[in-house]
């Protein structure tokens, strides 16, 4: 629990240092709900069964809520105490984008094909609503130097920052995709694709269209291009059943030393942030195709590591987190 003090340097100037008590233990909890729902509207056609073209209009609906709780026990010699901080954050809005793609089968007698796709940025119009609450209890113990008596004092503080509302626009990066695939003997299908997006090129604007220059420079300095590789195969083991397997690898979109930036006059106090590292995803599945009925069963395993920080501090060591997700999907 610190503040910043201004001190005289003895030479007619001043300098600043953090002041306060040392935290000797802390805890953090976070709850997230919602996300982004996307609705796609597609048009596709082919030329002589050799060239295939498609366009997709994507409409995104955003409804995301996050609440966090941070607590820290404090100790400074004979003084002690604790504080608790709660943050509530919600984002609502909508976005729109286009996806353009083409697939070519260059040799008529061969099943080999290759393709490419371009995804435009998603143009979002968003509203953030946030609030915070802090509770602290500090116990002081000190001596009166005149009569050498000890005194104790207790201080309780409850502060609530009312709701803050921010309307703004977000433009996500372009995405570029190339792919290739073939079939072997009519029994096995193989495919691979590569995708690139430079998240450092994301842009924020005020609701009137004015660029947020400081935030955009910060985005450019902390985010980078992300590379994604996907490979997959499907084998027909009988006239009705097929087995599938796939692998997805994505590099981190965060540069080394990336941090969360809050302005000094910002009402938000959710200082924690997480830098996700490379992500690995493995999928296996079984499919059934009958005359009147079909179904697919898949198992998906997703794992990636993260560096978690309760707040931005050059001396603060990251908390290493391993994230794992197991999903069983039936369609």
Positions of the model-derived regions?
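Outer-membrane beta-barrel porins/channels
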Residues: 1-331
């Amino acid at each position: 629990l610190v503040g910043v003090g201004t001190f005289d340097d003895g030479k007619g100037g001043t300098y600043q240092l953090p002041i306060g008590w040392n935290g000797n233990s802390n805890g953090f909890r976070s709850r997230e709900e919602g996300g982004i729902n996307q609705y796609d509207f597609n048009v596709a056609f082919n030329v002589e069964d050799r060239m295939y073209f498609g366009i997709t209009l994507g409409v995104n609906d955003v409804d995301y809520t996050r609440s966090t709780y941070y607590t820290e026990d404090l100790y400074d010699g004979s003084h002690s105490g604790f504080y608790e901080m709660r943050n509530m954050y919600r984002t609502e809005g909508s976005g729109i984008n286009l996806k353009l793609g083409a697939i070519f089968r260059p040799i008529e007698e061969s099943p080999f094909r290759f393709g490419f796709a371009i995804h435009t940025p998603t143009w979002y119009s968003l509203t953030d609503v946030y609030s915070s609450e802090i509770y602290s209890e500090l116990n002081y113990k000190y001596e009166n130097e005149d009569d050498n008596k000890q005194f104790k004092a207790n201080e309780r503080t409850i502060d609530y920052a009312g709701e803050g509302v921010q309307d703004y626009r977000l433009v996500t990066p372009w995405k570029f995709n190339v792919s290739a695939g073939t079939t072997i003997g009519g029994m096995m299908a193989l495919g691979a694709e590569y995708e690139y997006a430079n998240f450092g090129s994301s842009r924020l604007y005020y609701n009137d269209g004015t660029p947020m220059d400081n935030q955009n420079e910060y985005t450019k300095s902390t985010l980078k291009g992300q590379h994604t590789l996907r490979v997959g195969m499907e084998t027909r083991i009988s006239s009705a059943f097929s087995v599938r397997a796939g692998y997805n690898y994505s590099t981190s979109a965060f540069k080394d030393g990336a941090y969360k930036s809050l302005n000094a006059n910002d009402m938000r106090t959710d200082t924690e942030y997480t830098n996700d590292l490379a992500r690995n995803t493995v999928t296996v599945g079984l499919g059934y195709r009958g005359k009147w009925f079909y179904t697919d069963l898949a198992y998906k395993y997703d794992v990636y590591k993260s560096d978690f920080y309760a707040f931005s501090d050059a001396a603060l060591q990251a908390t290493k987190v391993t994230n794992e997700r197991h999903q069983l999907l039936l369609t």
